[in-house]
């Protein structure tokens, strides 16, 4: 399935959390997803994500902090997903990253048309394409569908959570000819074997939520001004 997410800073209300770690129990556990993340040009990292249902990042269990030196990181997701999280270095990069290929880039009638190829691995369970507000997205066409935006200057994320999205060609209609950076990520359910100790450290008063623990591998491409 495909979905288009429009993110605007003014639309997100973050809870300001101070003081001690909230009280959670086996009966009422905290939602904490663990993620192994690799992105182009950045070291691999572990992410502990508590931001579900738009509630923002809250303190993570002390057992996780003892297992890894997690720190609040506003750019933990490298824009693949909005908001921040707790992150810690995870050692050398170990995976091949997905790829973005520019197939055609042209301007006509005041609009920029960008055709791209997106390739993820055979292990991908889903993909995410991030288009920044600087691009002025009007529409995305792929697989016979056209998803339209109102052209508002906001960040956009195209999310496809099925394995058949591993290889896509998409056409972006843009109102801007400025330079910008596209980001593309594949999502794999579950963690690499090295994440087993973090799952143990999460303890029994915290549980994964929604799609659960994941491996996220991200690439990016800078589009020059046209």
Annotated model-derived regions:
Residues 1-40:
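Internal/C-terminal transmembrane anchor helices
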